[in-house]
Design a protein with these regions (language model features):
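Non-catalytic cap/lid and distal C-terminal segments of serine-dependent acyl enzymes
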Residues: 24-26, 31, 37-64, 69-370
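Bacterial Sec-dependent N-terminal signal peptides
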Residues: 1-27
Length: 370
């Protein structure tokens, strides 16, 4: 097993201290810090480039705004105030999109590489780093016979996992969305801190969280027709990923101690895998997901489903572009008589990681309580 173990409190602390000195003509150095979260929850963005003709910032809470060039070629703008949370943003420099070079906190994604600003406010958020025991996060590589290649996965172990070598734990397989990498539920969704806080409060069971990459096509060389290989994500998940996790971590290997779910595409993947493998999973979670009613034979025996599924949890925001599909799926389950738990949010951000974090916090409290 190859892994890099990260102590997440140190990781976040180092990110908050980022500061860079930039050289100027004549040997002068100017310290530029960005972003700066002000006491009124406004945010000042700074970017140094004396040669740029136009610089914009594009941030989730304010949209795209022009920045003003000041002394020493530092472009700046102050936006907000914004509600406390984590927001992705980027700079657009003469038409080219870049991350903030002063900020080490970034959003891992196939299609874009945004930076992240964390507005904390007076009240601690569900993902806040609190003075509680913290778990560990492992970056791992495993060999997939299905792919004929190596895959990536991130694993969270709860506080005191290493200090209790005889103790075994339930497992929650948590899948990120379309274009997201395996890192997103750690770096943006802050699954580790959410679970640390819930466990410390006694609001959730101790559990291992496994965060795989949901898009196996990215493992293959360009031009490979991955789709002709069939549903290789599910095949790898069942035949390669799960055995790897269970041989390297102290997991309780039965359906009553396995949960599966995810955000967006990951929620649909999780439901499809869970519903077609109820011999392996009994807790199912879908966060802001496109959900399918086209699973042959799955929904036919309602009594069997209700007896086998300990928790069928569905969450979506009313402003999410997938709200219509998610609501139709909920109505479909209700008409069938399939028991489920629903959670709705009312917000202006729609299909975002604000909701993904909130849904994880709500559903994790209900896992492994049977």
């Amino acid at each position: 097993m190859n892994f890099i173990r990260k102590k997440t409190v140190l990781l976040l602390t180092l990110g908050a201290l980022a500061l860079q000195a930039s050289a100027q003509p004549g040997g002068r150095f100017v310290q530029v810090k960005s972003p700066v979260v002000n006491t009124d929850n406004t945010v000042t963005f700074n970017y140094q480039n004396d040669k740029a003709k136009e610089v914009l910032v594009d941030v989730q809470f304010a949209g795209r705004k022009a920045m003003t060039k000041g002394e020493h070629g530092v472009w700046t703008v102050t936006l907000g105030p914004a509600a406390p949370d984590m927001y992705p943003y980027c700079f657009i420099v003469d038409g080219t999109t870049i991350m903030d070079p002063q900020n080490p906190d970034w959003f891992p994604n196939e299609g874009f590489k945004n930076s992240i600003v964390d507005i904390r406010g007076d009240k601690e958020l569900i993902h806040a780093v609190k003075n509680v025991p913290h778990g560990s996060v492992d970056y791992l590589t495993y060999y997939s016979k299905t792919f004929g290649l190596y895959g990536n996965v991130i694993v969270y172990t709860p506080p005191f996992y290493d200090q209790n070598p005889e103790k075994k734990y339930p497992v929650f397989y948590l899948i990120s969305g379309t274009t997201d990498t395996e890192e997103v539920y750690f770096k943006v969704g802050r699954a580790n801190f959410i679970l640390d806080n819930l466990i410390a409060e006694g609001a959730a069971k101790e559990m291992i969280i496994v965060m795989p990459y949901g898009n196996p096509a990215k493992y293959f060389p360009a031009g490979t027709n991955v789709w002709e290989k069939g549903d290789i994500f599910s095949k790898d998940f069942i035949n390669d990923l799960m055995p790897f996790v269970e041989s390297n971590y102290r997991t309780i290997n039965d359906r009553d101690h396995r949960a599966i779910g995810g955000f967006s595409r990951g929620g649909n993947q999780g439901l499809a895998l869970g519903l077609t493998n109820l011999d392996k999973f009994s807790y199912l979670c879908s966060y802001s997901s496109f959900t399918s009613m086209e699973l042959p034979g799955v929904y036919d025996n309602v009594d069997s489903l209700n007896n086998q599924i300990h928790l069928f949890w569905l969450g979506v925001g009313t402003d999410d572009f997938l709200y219509g599909n998610a609501k139709d799926y909920m109505d479909f389950l209700d008409k069938k008589g399939i028991k489920n738990v629903k959670e709705f949010t009312n917000d202006k951000f729609g299909h975002t990681w604000m909701n993904a974090k909130y849904f994880l916090d709500k559903s994790a409290r209900l896992l492994f309580n049977e």
